[in-house]
Amino acid sequence: MVAPRGSAQVAERLAPGSYLMFCLVRAPSGETHAIDGMVAEFTVTDQRAAADTPSATADLRLIDAGFRLPSPFPRHGVLRVTNQGKQAHEVTFLTLPSGRGRDAIDPYLRSLRNSSLLQSPPPLKPAGGVAALSPGGTATVTIDLPSGRYLAICLVRGPGGEPHALHGMVQTFTVR
């Protein structure tokens, strides 16, 4: 998830084939961004890209009940994000308001319980992350985070229909 007018740089190796990329975040109208045209199809060939995956400066692990975040969490660099869980997982970084902790996201998380698959974006400013990775999947994301407090959150829904964040995949961290 990227903040309005923001940008992100993520690298992931994909098997050759046809892919569809779309956004399920809801717009103020209630429609998903995909309905409004935020959809793209692309093809991955077996030709190797000219650029290699960037070298990682730190590792972040996605596990079935949480995150293993680097310590200290770097301000700048490339994070290698690996899903070590048995389910698909993602990580979105959200900026916490000054003086707030996890409580800043709790009302939003409660609203997701038993709600539909489509959801409004979290009420905190996104600061980057990596979209859903299959078990064993790895991606890199370039980060440039100001000093401050953040949340790492996974909003992928599990077999019971609830977002993983409701089962422990939400964690605060500080960037110095």
Regions from the PLM with identified roles:
Residues 1-64, 78, 129-133, 141:
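Extracytoplasmic entry segments of secretory-pathway proteins
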Residues 1-14, 101-145, 171, 175:
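Extracytoplasmic beta-sandwich strand-turn segments characteristic of Greek-key/jelly-roll folds
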Residues 28-68, 72, 84, 98-124, ...:
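Extracytoplasmic/periplasmic copper-protein system
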Residues 123, 129, 151-153, 161:
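Extended alpha-helical regions
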Residues 24-26, 93-99, 153-157:
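Predominantly extracellular/luminal cell-surface or secreted proteins
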Residues 57-101, 133-148:
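Surface-exposed interaction/gating patches
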Residues 17-23, 145-154:
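A short tyrosine-centered beta-strand micro-motif
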